[in-house]
């Protein structure tokens, strides 16, 4: 049977995501009459009368007062250099209505392509709002369009906005105040409110300890509205931390003393661990002063999201921050770094060089309290000096000879290559397997046989059980809940060294990251890669070198890998497993193929664009040929081992569209077909197919009917053939849905036909939908073809509150079996510089979240399994392909298993068919011993050898500094300088201080 149970976190239905935001302006400059008169280079003008006001400020000390005398006579905030909001989804603004009547107003965004004629409304986006009488409200403007009353120009570009207009929609004169314009492009799901104990801290070296908060320091000067106390609830160092309750906005803490950090290095930063265990985001600001500052210094800021714990740091040189993933990958070759900068982009004030030998104050203060809150609390711990992560020097020699973090020590770090070589045999001797399943890993007590997908399966099938739950069915006829691990191969363990195939493109920064480059498993011409500072050049696999040191050969590694899967209770080798493992004869596997890339592929017409690439034209004859070539490749890979073949994935995370943006990305790929030339049938088979469908199935009455629906003026069907850029209009929606379905159906059906020709009666598992790349139309088309639907789901669970209620409803309505191709959680306590797509606070938290996710999947009637991505941690210095540097493995880069993860997996996998497996918990006294359910002795056993030494101890902390006069923190809004040009690894990055 399928077990119906949920963890407490899922059953409690975690809060919906909260928004993170970046400040654009809060109008703190004195003069906005011209962009030349203020450091933000903004201009406020227009037909309405506007002025800077100290009344009704919602962020900082000032707002803009706008006096409107008639409808559609605007006040406009201009940025003539334009804002790039391409990565954002929402612009928000605080509006104060001091009048006794409600006021309806409009916001209109203008992009720079409207120049020079100022008449093309397609370059604008307009929406309407109502602010209630005598209230302050925050309004959100959808940068992608789609609101009920929004007019979103088909050519509007959110990455080049030059103007934000505010205007009345009625003629009654009114006064409104505007403040705190922000943009928002990401969300965070807060964890349960009970918080975590001993949460993570950034794995970077401490140069000097400032404060560990075991007690409240006597040199701390809190403002009158701040209450401080020690806490043990959230601790990153020692046994206690400091909780600071802020009872009013712009309250702060001042650590006052004298510190000498001049000898710690040229580029350093002050770091502190901060936790926000509330339901509201908090803006936190910092100021660092020296003996000469006299209260005049730059303010830098960061958003601490609801439920978030992280390390933040303030650069003592004010080096520019790499705030986006694209910037980090481009400059460093790393997707993420382990701490968040207090940045100039989120602060204000000109930086003045500090005398690091005479630092006198460290200040932290918050912005406004969240709406409706009377106080907000942050927990501070482990304040120290670190190398400045904004500067290249922080990454020098970050890896040791085994590719481990060379800056700190941590649990599971291997002490030396000599110790690594001793670890394989003891682990092999401890491994066993679960006893409560059949030879395939199925449930011997369940034999589903209703509504089976395949009439005569060659190996695995999918059927319903007596309770109406979908189940995979193994060759023995038993229910099989597929749990497994992806990417069991060496290909993605390579990292770029910085040596380029083109000497002019080498990265000295990348080269500085390594203390030693192994001589084996080196690819001198890796690439071209997806992204990074070196597009093609030398790459090395530390993991592959380590497995040879640990196990002596790849054959032994493959053997122990399969034995680990059995020991941990996994019954499937997940996607992108090395085909050499297919013949293992013990653990079933999934195979995979690529429809358009690989050897002997013919060129195929490409449609539109996407994160991983455009879509292939499925009507192109070469596409069918390539699919057949792919199917033959898969057949050759699985030949002789078909019995253990669970099913076949083809392609991955294709960019079909996005459900959140009807007028934009939802139908962008479908509309892109019309931008291809169909005048020759061979030039765009997709275009000709679309025209045929429209003429013969949608508009059989003639072209005039299409013109009426689409607002076009085609003289004939032939006139639709040339390439043209069509903008979405509401009259197209039903046609777009129909055509998107046809496109996807042709793709899935062509692939399925090729697979069934070579591998009949094996399960086709689809293409692994990403949340950002699927629409209901495409899902429906896939369901008409594939045997088992597949999704990659990076959420805390598949519960509606965590994932997608609409997607779940569609799955249940379609009533197909579903498998999850990818999910994971990552943490920083393994020495990694990045957690993963979904974060955890520790290895224990990773394990707990993994089990909760699996429980949610196992409890749903349609879901038949889930595979963890991935087997091996990303390289510490980033995956060669795209800089991915996550702690998401079941093993580290020394091939050391994460014991907390493997123990949790074993206990869940043992119990997923209904057995009480609590005796396998690593909390039991006889945890490592064999028993009735498990033949191994591996529970609670670490395979990392003796503890690795600490690379270096920090400088002794100074004696508590003398007590200077008490100082207060003054509030301020978001004024900022215009541009800062600084170097990072020889690459000059032009950085805007605000969005």
Curated annotation (Swiss-Prot):
Residues 1-20 form the signal peptide. Keywords: Glycosidase, Hydrolase, Signal. InterPro entries: Agarase_CBM, Glycoside_hydrolase_SF. Transmembrane segments: none annotated. SUPFAM superfamilies: (Trans)glycosidases. Pfam families: Agarase_CBM. Its EC number is 3.2.1.81. GO terms for molecular function: beta-agarase activity. It catalyses: Hydrolysis of (1->4)-beta-D-galactosidic linkages in agarose, giving the tetramer as the predominant product. Belongs to the glycosyl hydrolase 50 family. Hydrolyzes agarose and also neoagarotetraose to yield neoagarobiose. This is Beta-agarase A. It comes from Vibrio sp. (strain JT0107).
């Amino acid at each position: 049977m399928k077990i119906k149970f949920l963890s407490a976190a899922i059953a409690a239905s975690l809060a919906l995501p909260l928004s993170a935001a970046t400040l654009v302006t809060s109008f703190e400059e004195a003069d906005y009459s011209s962009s030349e008169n203020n450091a933000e280079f903004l201009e406020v003008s227009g037909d309405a009368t506007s002025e800077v006001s100290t009344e009704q400020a919602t962020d900082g000390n000032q707002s803009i007062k706008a006096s409107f005398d008639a409808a559609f006579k605007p006040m406009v905030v201009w940025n003539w250099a334009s804002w790039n909001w391409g990565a954002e989804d929402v612009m928000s603004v605080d509006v104060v209505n001091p009048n006794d009547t409600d006021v309806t107003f409009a916001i209109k965004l203008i992009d720079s392509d409207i120049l020079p004629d100022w008449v093309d409304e397609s370059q604008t986006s307009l929406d309407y709002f109502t602010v209630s009488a005598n209230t302050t409200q925050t309004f959100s403007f959808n940068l992608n369009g789609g609101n009920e009353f929004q007019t979103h120009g088909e050519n509007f570009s959110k990455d080049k906005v030059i103007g934000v207009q505010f205007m009345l929609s009625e003629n009654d004169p009114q006064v409104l105040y505007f403040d705190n314009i922000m943009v928002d492009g990401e969300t965070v799901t807060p964890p349960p409110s009970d918080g975590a104990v001993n949460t993570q801290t950034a794995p970077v070296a401490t140069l000097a300890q400032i404060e560990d908060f075991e007690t409240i320091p006597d040199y701390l000067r809190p403002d009158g509205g701040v209450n401080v106390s020690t806490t043990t609830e959230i601790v990153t160092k020692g046994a206690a931390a400091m909780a600071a309750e802020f009872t009013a906005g712009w309250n702060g803490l001042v650590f006052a003393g004298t510190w000498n950090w001049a000898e710690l290095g040229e580029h350093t930063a002050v770091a502190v661990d901060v936790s926000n265990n509330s339901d509201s985001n908090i803006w936190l600001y910092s100021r660092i002063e020296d003996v000469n500052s006299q209260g005049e210094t730059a303010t830098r800021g960061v958003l601490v999201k609801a439920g978030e714990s992280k390390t933040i740091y303030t650069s003592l040189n004010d080096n520019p921050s790499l705030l986006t993933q694209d910037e980090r990958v481009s400059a460093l070759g790393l997707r993420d770094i382990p701490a968040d900068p207090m940045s100039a982009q989120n602060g204000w004030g000109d930086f003045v060089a500090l005398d690091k030998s005479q630092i006198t104050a460290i200040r932290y203060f918050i912005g406004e309290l969240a709406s409706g809150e009377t106080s907000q609390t942050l927990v501070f711990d482990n304040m120290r000096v670190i190398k400045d992560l904004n500067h290249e020097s922080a990454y020098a020699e970050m890896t040791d000879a085994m590719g481990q973090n060379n800056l700190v020590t941590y649990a599971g770090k291997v002490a030396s290559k000599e110790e690594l070589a001793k670890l394989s045999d003891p682990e092999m001797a401890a491994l066993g397997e679960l006893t409560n399943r059949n030879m395939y890993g199925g449930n011997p007590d369940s034999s589903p046989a209703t509504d089976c997908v395949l009439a005569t399966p060659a190996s695995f099938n999918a059927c319903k059980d007596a309770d109406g739950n979908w189940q995979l069915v193994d060759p023995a006829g038993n229910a099989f809940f597929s749990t497994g691990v992806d990417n069991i191969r060496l290909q993605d363990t390579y990292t770029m060294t910085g040596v380029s195939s083109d000497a002019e493109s080498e990265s000295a920064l990348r080269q500085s990251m390594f203390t030693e480059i192994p001589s084996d498993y080196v690819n001198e011409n890796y690439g071209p890669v997806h992204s990074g500072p070196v597009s093609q050049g030398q790459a090395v696999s530390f993991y592959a070198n380590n497995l040879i040191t640990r196990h002596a050969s790849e054959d032994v590694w493959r053997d122990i890998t399969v034995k680990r899967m059995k020991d941990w209770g996994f019954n499937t080798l997940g996607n992108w497993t090395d085909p050499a493992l297919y013949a293992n004869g013990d653990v079933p596997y999934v195979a995979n193929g690529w429809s358009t890339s690989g050897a002997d592929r013919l060129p195929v017409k490409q449609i539109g664009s996407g994160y991983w690439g455009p879509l292939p034209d499925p009507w192109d004859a070469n596409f069918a040929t390539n699919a057949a070539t792919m199917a033959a490749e898969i057949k050759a890979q699985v030949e002789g081992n078909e019995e253990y073949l669970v099913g076949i994935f083809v392609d991955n995370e294709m960019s079909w569209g996005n459900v959140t943006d009807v007028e934009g990305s939802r139908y962008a790929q479908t509309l892109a077909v019309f931008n291809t030339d169909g005048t020759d049938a061979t030039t765009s088979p997709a275009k000709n197919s679309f025209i045929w469908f429209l003429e013969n199935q949608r508009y059989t009455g003639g072209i005039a009917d299409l013109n009426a629906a689409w607002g076009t003026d085609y003289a004939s069907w032939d006139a639709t053939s040339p390439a043209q850029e069509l903008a979405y209009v509401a009259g197209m929606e039903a046609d777009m849905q129909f055509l998107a379905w046809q496109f996807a159906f042709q793709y899935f059906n062509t692939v399925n036909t090729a697979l069934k020709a070579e591998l009949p009666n094996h399960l086709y598992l689809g293409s692994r939908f990403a949340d950002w790349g699927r629409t209901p139309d495409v899902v429906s088309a896939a369901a008409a073809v594939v045997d088992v639907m597949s999704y990659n789901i990076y959420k805390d669970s598949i519960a509606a509150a965590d994932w997608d209620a609409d997607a779940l409803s569609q799955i249940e309505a379609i009533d197909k079996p579903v498998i999850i191709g990818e999910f994971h959680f990552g943490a920083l306590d393994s020495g990694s510089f990045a957690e993963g797509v979904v974060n955890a606070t520790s290895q224990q938290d990773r394990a707990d979240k993994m089990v909760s996710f699996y429980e949610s999947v196992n409890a749903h009637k349609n879901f038949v399994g889930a595979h963890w991505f991935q087997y091996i941690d990303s390289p510490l210095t980033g995956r060669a392909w795209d800089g991915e540097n996550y702690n998401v493995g079941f093993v580290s880069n020394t091939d050391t298993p994460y014991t907390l993860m493997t123990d949790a997996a074993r206990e869940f996998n043992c119990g997923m068919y209904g057995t009480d497996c609590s005796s396998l918990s690593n909390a039991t006294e006889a945890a490592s011993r064999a028993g009735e359910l498990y033949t191994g002795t591996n529970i609670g056993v670490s395979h990392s050898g003796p503890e690795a030494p600490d690379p270096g101890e920090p400088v002794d902390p100074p004696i508590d500094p003398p007590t200077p006069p008490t100082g207060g923190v003054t509030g301020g809004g978001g004024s900022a300088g215009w541009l800062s040009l600084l170097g990072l690894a020889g690459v000059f990055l032009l950085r805007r201080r605000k969005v």
